[in-house]
Amino acid sequence: SGDWSGCEAVAITGGRLSTASGRVQLAVPDAERREMMQSAARSAGTKALLYVTGGSNALQGKSAETAAALAQAVEDGGYDGLYLDLPQLADNRRTALTETVAALREKLGEKLLYVTAEAPAWQGKTYSAYDYAALAASADRLVLRVAPYQKTADGFTVAPLEPMEEVYCALAELKDTVPAGKLSLLLTTAGSQWKNGKRVSNPNSGEIAELLADEKNTESYYSSRYACAYLVQKAQGNTVTVWYLDRQAAEARRQMCAFFGVDQICLSSLDAVSQQLLEGLR
């Protein structure tokens, strides 16, 4: 849960799309949890969306059948719309996603339709599975997920969340393809914790606050290069590094979005979010 006031929509997790023997299968959140979350959302004056994710077999059925199953779940569950998040789609699913989202637009009518797309990559892998213009034409919002950046130099892990270079390049790449009012930037509200060069956990704001409170063993920093906060804790022979978005980092990303005319930011979770991060978005 969390404070949802000021949010346009809240996505209720628990939906999962898959295909077995050509048949579309859709798991949805249980009724008790759904009703509790919908009630909280409406009390805050925000829309409640059904959040649906899926793996590599999510779009192997017919697009019309997939869209029909998703739209029916939205209707049956009394949701205000759908948030479809199919991460790192293979290139051969491009047409299926475009067709499914177009069919969803028709079936959902006035209900909200949010779709996540991997941002065009500046470094490394480029995702060509997303027809950004076509998806944005059908969806109310195209939510961009920016790839994390990870490297180790001299034993120190550099792993900023939603790196600014990547954010800039993604928005610059899409500015002539997708109307700014259709875009939203996804920000990770949890941190990224590393030990001995390996990612070990995703601490929430409370856990990060605990580490910062250990002033004897913890130093906090802000990387202007990546516009991201990080802390280093050295205790009992171990070194732990946590990268996270604080007020300054959130504000930098909000300003970058504003520069490109993008007026919405999507938070990965309100359970893990810090007041600092929220302040940076105001």
Label each region the model flagged:
Residues 8-12, 46-52, 82-84, 113-117, ...:
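Hydrophobic faces of well-ordered beta-strands that scaffold small-molecule active sites
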Residues 234-282:
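Extracellular low-complexity, Gly/Ser/Thr-rich intrinsically disordered linkers
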Residues 2-23, 70-84, 253-268:
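Catalytic domains of carbohydrate-active enzymes, especially glycoside hydrolases
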Residues 20-29, 91-213:
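Substrate-binding surface in catalytic domains of secreted glycosidases
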Residues 1-6, 60-76, 124-134, 245-258:
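Short, acidic/polar
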Residues 182-253:
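Glycan-binding loop/region signatures in secreted carbohydrate-active enzymes
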Residues 1-64:
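Glycan-recognition patch characteristic of GH18 chitinases/ENGases
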Residues 14, 67-96, 141-155, 266:
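Active-site groove signature of glycoside hydrolases
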